[in-house]
Amino acid sequence: VALNILVDAPKFDFPSISAALDQSSLTDSAAFKIYGLLLIGFGILVALFPFHTWAARGYDSAPTSVSMLHAGVLKKFGLYGIIQIASPLLPEAALAWSPLLMWLALGNILLVGMVAVAQTNFKSMISYGSVMHMGYCFLGIGVCSVLGVGSTVMLMCAHGLSVSLMFLLANFVRK
């Protein structure tokens, strides 16, 4: 909404906003800040490091069906938002944020992965492992290439199916 108002786009759809962005005098600094704010918003939903602490605890304490739905489907909306909204609208800012995004993704993979290995509860291990796998998705987005984004989409599909079934398996094992 703010981007639509900022560039004075005639309609509220992404092609009009993108065309208005191309014709506007949006500075690189403003685009960098806007992309950063979008990255923070979507990163909180996906549980990007350092905004990751809520996710694993939430999955662990939620009923199994809620954990399956959130980890398998809803978490992917944040990645989809970065791939379909933030990066196409602000491609230069996406390239500028790329190194930091890959470092944050590496933090997701290494730090959360170590916490996942240390878990003694099966559902907790799956929860932290799910958060860790989002780091691989962010690495693919951070590469800023067709191959990186394609591999991210493939991992999103595979993760959605596998983590949902792992939560279901954890529920069966617990009972």
Where do the protein language model's features map onto the residues?
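Hydrophobic transmembrane alpha-helices and their helix-loop junctions in integral membrane proteins
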Residues: V1-K175
